[in-house]
Amino acid sequence: RQMCIRDRKYDYDTTFFRFADYRTGEENAMQGAASGRTVSITHSDHYKTSFRYDPQARTYKMQMYSRISGKFENTVDELNAKQLSFDNLLVCFAPIERYPGDSGDVQQVSYISGGDAYCFSRGGVQHGRWEKASPEHPLRVYDKTGAEMLFNRGKTYLAIVDDDEWSNFSYQ
């Protein structure tokens, strides 16, 4: 299977990330990983998310900051009234700028620059780097040794965060 973009051909016989193979029971147990049971991400002054790991469900429960209440509130799916949860969180830092001359809040992300990446799963965190060869290529995430990170199967929350917000990012 191939996909044509701008008269270029790229093989897309893989998933967006390198997911654990369900056929073999493969899993990233996050052995030796630092604790990543709570995660706080500031995207901007008005957009903040937090996640808390639920060891029973093996997922991260999502909350968003409400300027009205002044506190974090559960992020709930309108269709089923359940709190959103994710098996993996991927936080990627990148240079983000406003489009020149744009009067709204449209952002331009430098996707091909790469940057720091934090992968959270099973209550742990792996620090590494993300890269994209071009806007048309898939995003790749590598650990400190240069090996491509293995993501556990399930829903993955991907956050692209401005480098300027790095000091407001925390986990424990």
What are the functions of these language-model segments?
Residues 2, 6-172:
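A surface/extracellular/periplasmic glyco- and lipid-processing/surface-interacting theme
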